[in-house]
Amino acid sequence: MVNMKASMFLTFAGLVLLFVVCYASESEEKEFPKEMLSSIFAVDNDFKQEERNCAGYMRECKEKLCCSGYVCSSRWKWCVLPAPWRR
């Protein structure tokens, strides 16, 4: 049973490696690893840290006001989404 699991895992890993090698050889750009990693771990603009006058989601709202669409939680002092029980 263990040998069958190991052979299936090695077969699957080999197929994945074969796919990556074939895709890399067909790609004309030399920046393939960097491009592949950046597409896998793409960061949306909403998640980037930016300097602004208001506090975003789950940020402290003691000194800054929350951005539009968020309210300051009276219990935790974080900016959170408004909900009926938080009004």
Swiss-Prot record:
SUPFAM superfamilies: omega toxin-like
Species of the source: Cyriopagopus hainanus
Domain observations: The presence of a 'disulfide through disulfide knot' structurally defines this protein as a knottin.
Tissue spec. comment: Expressed by the venom gland.
GO molecular function: ion channel inhibitor activity; potassium channel regulator activity; toxin activity
Protein name: U3-theraphotoxin-Hhn1n
Keywords on record: Disulfide bond, Ion channel impairing toxin, Knottin, Potassium channel impairing toxin, Secreted, Signal, Toxin, Voltage-gated potassium channel impairing toxin
Membership in a protein family: Belongs to the neurotoxin 10 (Hwtx-1) family. 51 (Hntx-8) subfamily. Hntx-8 sub-subfamily.
Record's function text: Weakly inhibits Kv11.1/KCNH2/ERG1, Kv1.2/KCNA2, Kv1.3/KCNA3, and Kv2.1/KCNB1.
GO CC terms of this entry: extracellular region
PROSITE patterns in the cross-refs: HWTX_1 (PS60021)
Proregion span(s): 25-52
InterPro entries: Huwentoxin-1 (IPR011696), Huwentoxin_CS1 (IPR013140)
Record localization: Secreted
Record-linked Pfam families: Toxin_12
Disulfide feature: C54-C67, C61-C72, C66-C79
Signal peptide: 1-24
